[in-house]
Amino acid sequence: MASTRTALVTGTTHGIGRATAFALGRAGWQVGCCARNADDVDLLLAQLADAGIRAAGRPADVSEEREVRTVAHHVVEALGPVDALINNAGVLIAKPFEQLTLADWDRTMATNLRSLYLMTREVLPEMRRRRRGTIVNVASLAGRNGFVGGTAYTASKHAVLGFSKSLMLEVRKDDVRVIAICPGSVDTGLIRDQPLLKADSTRILRPEDVAATIVHVLELPDHALVSELDIRPTNP
């Protein structure tokens, strides 16, 4: 893969996003980074630099239009046009429905869905103009199923899959690929911080497993499109 290709990854400082940043860098990509916490972003950029990976980024709330525009422009100015966008930022609030507040619902939709819309809207026009680019949306197997306490999360991930399917059909004629990655349970803070969810961390997926999958689909020939891909623990 040419070293001049640039990937912009949202939610980059922890979990799948962090693992993806390093996996892409090791594969020769330049990496654009963003997350809410400025100190976490600075630390990640320093660690990527120490690993010999060219990266740029800034703190951003990717559910806010102005901040999305600012971080996207910053990455383009520092690294060049975005060849791959990985919409990874996400939140999981697992509660029985009657305990789910409107604030919980709005935060889930803003982080998991609104951010995806805003970031895609920001980078897609240039991809279409260049007739080159890939958008990877990190969905979930919860986008096909449900689970107790998951009304907000599963609603958002069903929406991510619907968004991805429709956009894929819309932009493939412009040689832009849209891919939805659907992980099962992954050992990240999203699960560890939810007492309602129980998972054996020794048996579920690791962030690096999902990151390797993302790199794999990105490095397929440009004429090949894996529109959806499920990855799940072998024996959870």
Feature locations, PLM:
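The beta1-alpha1 cofactor-binding region of Rossmann-like NAD(H)/NADP(H)-dependent oxidoreductases
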Residues: 38, 59-71, 102
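Conserved glycine-rich Rossmann-like NAD(P)H-binding loop of the short-chain dehydrogenase/reductase
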Residues: 29-44
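Substrate-binding pocket helix/loop in short-chain dehydrogenase/reductase
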Residues: 96-97, 104-106
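Conserved glycine-rich cofactor-binding loop
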Residues: 13-14
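Active-site helix of classical SDR
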Residues: 120, 156
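Residue(s) in the substrate-gating loop at a strand-loop-helix junction
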Residues: 140
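C-terminal helical subdomain
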Residues: 173, 180-181, 196-236
